[in-house]
Amino acid sequence: MISEKRRFALRRYITSSAFGHSAWEILHAPLYRGWMPGLISETPLLLARCVIIDTLLALAALSLAVWLTGNSGWPDAGYWAAGGRAIAVGVVLAIFAEWLNVYLLGTWNYSSPMPIVPFLNVGVSPLLQWVLVPGLSLWWARPKGLPD
């Protein structure tokens, strides 16, 4: 059975994650080329797909992190330990997704303004996305009384 506090934290995390990933996807879309269609009417559907995938990955990363932490008392105990692991899992997933879609599948490409992490050959923006959006979402979703 899931405690009310856990439900509350998960709802806030998923909601803030969806809003954060929505804003990020819209703002960093110009850093990509080749995946946005010529018709402006298709762009919202592609962005929605990205946001849905990002939100589901954020939930999966947090679930895996809570499990890896081995603490069934989350969010009351081990909140930030699980949060740090969730961010790490998200960054690893982002690196894999960027590599897969840019270099293997060719689903999208980076435009010239996208800064690249040299040793990983992936864009800086998606990596920052998977540090900042989950980090802020975890901060906002934390239970009352938990230290910042």
How would you describe each model-predicted region?
Residues 1-148:
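Aromatic-rich, lipid-facing transmembrane alpha helices and their immediate juxtamembrane interface loops
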